[in-house]
Design a protein with these regions (language model features):
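Short loop/turn segments that flank or connect secondary-structure elements
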Residues: 1-192
Length: 192
């Protein structure tokens, strides 16, 4: 890990400890990761640290005629985050009903990349919950993701350069059907 990321991690650790003195609930249920840190954090949906857009494909069921009211758009089916943040981020978190949020938002801090499922290091929930709990939720997310149409699932995954992935994400080693990794034969669907 780079020295820059170590400083950044320590900075966020101190910031999150002050802002969140008590542990909050985080759980995965029916395709949505419910994260009680989000409403008071808004780090991931606020203005980003660069102008390069972070693409978030929308499922066909989430697309409607006035998407530009909810999101900055890269394409008719792709919302994005950049240095402007998100149009739907309000003072208490997301203003959209859960079913209208991009899958990327519904999974965060789990991140669907073209190589599998990862965990974003800077999220306060990642700092405060044990990794084994994240692995359980990640397996539940994979089990939900594979119920989507294969073409939708593949389009939802994004590509991030490997150096950035190593710096900002935890590799959960959970491949998906389209990822170049071989599925782990020991992986069993999480029984709910």
């Amino acid at each position: 890990m780079s020295e820059k990321m170590q400083k950044s991690s320590w900075h966020y650790w101190q910031q999150w400890r002050q802002r969140f003195p008590l542990q909050r609930d985080v759980h995965f249920d029916q395709g949505i990761l419910s994260n009680d840190y989000c409403r008071d954090c808004r780090y991931c949906c606020g203005p980003q640290d660069c102008a390069t857009p972070y693409p978030m494909k929308l499922l066909p069921s989430q697309q409607h005629d006035h998407l530009e009211r909810d999101f900055f758009l890269l394409a008719p089916d792709t919302a994005c985050l950049d240095d402007r943040g998100c149009k739907s981020c309000g003072p208490e978190g997301c203003l959209l009903p859960r079913q209208r949020r991009p899958v990327a938002c519904s999974l965060f801090p789990l991140v669907l990349l073209d190589t599998g499922l990862y965990l974003y290091k800077i999220c306060p929930a990642v700092f405060f919950l044990p990794l084994d709990r994240w692995l359980v939720m990640a397996r539940e997310a994979v089990n939900w993701l594979v119920t989507l149409a294969p073409e939708d699932l593949k389009q939802l995954a994004i590509h991030i350069p490997e150096a950035i992935v190593r710096e900002r994400f935890i590799d959960l080693e959970l491949p998906l059907p389209f990822s170049p990794r071989m599925p782990d034969p020991a992986h069993q669907p999480v029984q709910g």
